[in-house]
Amino acid sequence: MRGPAVPLTKMEHYLVLTEDIEATKEFYCRALGMHVGFRPPLEFPGYWLYVGDTPCIHIAEWQTYTAHSQRRGIPVSTRAPGTGPFDHIAFNAENFDEVLARLESHGVRPGHNAVTGTSLRQLFLTDPNGVKIEINVRT
């Protein structure tokens, strides 16, 4: 049984906790073409990475973010490698060959999938922290 819907309007962002915020930032900016954008003055190191005008990935240094959260009574994720309790995050793109070439030019060798009976082609890769990323292209 389903109750009343929560009035959600969109997915906003996901947070990657890492020991190396610089390497993580470089991966998303170089391999996926995101850019660093505005981030308010928070009490822990990190970046907000944008696709266009949307800040979709937040990156924070693991230890300082965890300490910050604990001080405020915010639940802290367990330190599981990779994606922890979720499997992956997905993005849409427009040109499969262009995306593949860009990834490969940065040393990323993604897995490929074509969804039978559809025009959907997919790429699967991981960031430097083991977070699995899916890129969907409809041809």
Feature map (PLM): residue ranges:
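Core segments of cupin and vicinal oxygen chelate
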Residues: L17-I57, E61-W62, S105
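Acetyl-CoA-dependent GNAT
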Residues: E61-T64, V137-T139
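N-terminal beta-strand motif that seeds the catalytic metal site of vicinal oxygen chelate
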Residues: M1-A23, F86-F91
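Short beta-strand
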Residues: F38-P41, D87, N113-V115
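Short, flexible, mixed-charge acidic loops at enzyme active sites
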Residues: Q63-S77
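Vicinal oxygen chelate
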Residues: M1-P7, F91, L100-T139
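Exposed loop/turn and edge beta-strand positions of beta-sandwich/beta-sheet ligand-binding modules
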Residues: E43, P85, S119
